[in-house]
A protein has these predicted regions:
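Metal-ion/cofactor- or nucleotide/acyl-coenzyme-handling active-site neighborhoods
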Residues: 1-206
């Protein structure tokens, strides 16, 4: 499969990059509240609160949605009829689940955007980090000034994808000088191009 995949987390670093423009360049896997404004090729949502929000709309009827099954969904026939369920359920966060889905579908080159991991530093000494999510302060999300969740699980789940799919080349797009977790500091099948390099490669603007 020559086509590339784009896997979108919701970290602030991808703000301004339109998923619709990426759909013209490859297959887009995106997460959670993206559904409010866009229709990626695949929407991945594993949090029950987010899935129940999505169930209030007809999004799943007209678009591809991937999730973990939960008994709470038995009252929502639309979800039962139209969602593709992870088998077995990974118990992972949405972003790494989307990344693994792209790998399992056979993509050999995957661009990862919005996987920032680290929160937004509140002070120069970086003693505290606040939520880093473009949907902060909206329904089913923390407030923007809430303390960031520790990213260790997200990073380890990402690393598991890299280890399990060694024939896939991963490109984690970050701002120049952006945060690189020590757990992802190897060169075997991942690199960290800058946002500007990514935009230039695909002839995109933000």
């Amino acid at each position: 499969m020559a086509e590339v995949a784009f896997v979108l987390g919701n970290g602030q670093s991808r703000k301004g990059i339109d998923p619709n423009n990426l759909k013209e360049k490859g297959t887009v896997f995106a997460c959670n509240a993206v559904y409010r404004t866009h229709q990626p090729h695949w929407l991945v949502a594993v949090d029950p609160k987010m899935m129940l929000e999505i169930a209030e709309t007809d999004y799943v009827v007209h678009n591809k949605v991937y999730s973990n099954y939960n008994r709470q969904y038995e009252k929502h026939q639309k979800l039962l009829d139209h969602v593709t369920w992870s088998k077995p359920s990974l118990g992972w966060s949405s972003g790494p689940t989307a990344l693994r889905l792209a790998c399992e579908q056979g993509f050999k080159e995957i661009y990862i955007l919005g996987f920032d991991y680290q929160g937004l530093a509140v002070d120069a000494n970086k003693n505290r980090f606040n939520l880093n999510n473009i949907y902060g302060h909206t329904r089913n999300y923390k407030r923007s000034n809430d303390q960031a969740t520790f990213f260790g699980n997200w990073m380890n789940q990402t690393k598991k994808c890299l280890q399990d799919f060694k024939d896939v080349q991963f490109h984690r797009v970050i701002p120049a000088g952006g945060y690189q977790p020590k757990g992802l500091e190897w060169k075997d099948n991942i690199d960290h191009p800058s946002t500007e390099e990514f935009l230039e490669k695909f002839n995109l603007t933000r």
